Every structure is written in structure tokens, then in C-alpha cells.
Amino acid sequence: MTASATRKLIDRYYAAFNAQDTDTMLDCLGTGFVHDVSQGERRKGKKRFAEFLAHMHKCYHEQLSDIAVMTSTDGARAAAEFKLEGRYLATDEGLPPAAGQTYRLTVGAFFEIEDGKITRVSTHYSLPDWTRQVIG
């Protein structure tokens, strides 16, 4: 896969995220997909990721902006940094109570690509910063 094709794949993935289009996000993912979150558990497989997205859509409304995507020359890896703006809609287990609070975070993500699909995404953000923002 070329660097240009990888960039288009990541752009499609994040456009689907902003549209809350789970089907398109899942279509961007390859066999054996793995989702790592710096502040949470590892999820293996599209089914687990779809369950995660459903939970996220219930508890949060989030939009990404200022997305900067970088790719390796062979297109096998990519990284992205972006601004995430969100609203906390429903209390998530183990987190402060939700009351429609807004928050803004800088997030980084790293991707592995095989056969034109994302096989791993690792997302990194500051949970302490998010907590400070929603507690007030």
C-alpha cells in the first residue's frame, strides 16, 4: 500500500468517526484488528470494537478537528494527531457523573496497515486532563 493510499484510508476512518458511521469505520478495519487505548483495555476484533463504539456513542458525542496524518514511506504505518471536542452525555462506569460537560483534548494515534486495511490502532490521550475538565 502506498503512503497516499494509507493517508486516504486514515482520512476515511476519521471522517466516519465524525459522522458516527460505525459501518464505514468497521469497513476500514482488517482481519485480526486490535484497538489499544493508553488509558484502557486492549480490544481484539471488529465485534469488540463495534461494541466499544456503541458504548462511546451512548456516553459521549465527540468530533475531531485539525487532524494531521503522517505515514511511513511504504504505507505500512501511520500516525495522527488531532483535537477532540466532546460532550459527556451519560455516566461511564468508574468515571465522574455525566451532566453534559464539554471537554477538549489533544489526541495521538498510531496505525498499522495490511492489505489496505487498518490492523491496529493505538490511541493516546490524557485521562487526568479529561477528568479535570469534566469535574470543573
Where are the predicted features?
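C-terminal and inter-domain tail/linker signature
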Residues: 1-136
